[in-house]
């Protein structure tokens, strides 16, 4: 099975260490990456099973796994721990993500050449067995292609106005946006641009 959550052996090692604690807190791991640079960064993306996560919940995860990582000490060098939401243009790492975001535009890459290409951009059309279905524009036609999940090396949603609008609507419907915290928009009746 393809592992888009934790790609490298170090990512998988970190996942083995932190995933049980994150799940015990009631969250799901979306992606784990150890990224190099001047200082290594351990990036963990998580969310509630129903989607979404707030800053306080990220801090809760960070505090819980910081203690664990101090004990396990899996990284030799200094590192920064970054716990965040997957974001709007999120990575798609689990088969269920492709069902959840059916109807939205995504970019996908495969490890194998399929029809002479490895990169695809289209509208997610769900899942059938272990295949991710994608509607691709080919000329004036739309063709549905099934990509084996195990062949995927990368996948993420494309940031579109439609996606932003839907995510904001979901947050508002879930009561996560309190409109009373925003300033009222004042219009100047003497200014024709308002």
From Swiss-Prot:
Keyword terms: Cytoplasm, Ribosome biogenesis
InterPro entries: Ribosome_maturation_RimP, RimP_C, RimP_C_sf, RimP_N, RimP_N_sf
Domain of life of the native organism: Bacteria
GO biological processes: ribosomal small subunit assembly; translation
PANTHER family linked to this entry: RIBOSOME MATURATION FACTOR RIMP
NCBIfam families reported in the protein's UniProt record: PRK00092.2-5 (NF000932)
Alphabetical list of HAMAP family matching this protein: RimP
Family: Belongs to the RimP family.
General function of this protein: Required for maturation of 30S ribosomal subunits.
The protein's name: Ribosome maturation factor RimP
Top-level taxonomy: Bacteria, Pseudomonadati, Pseudomonadota, Alphaproteobacteria, Rhodobacterales
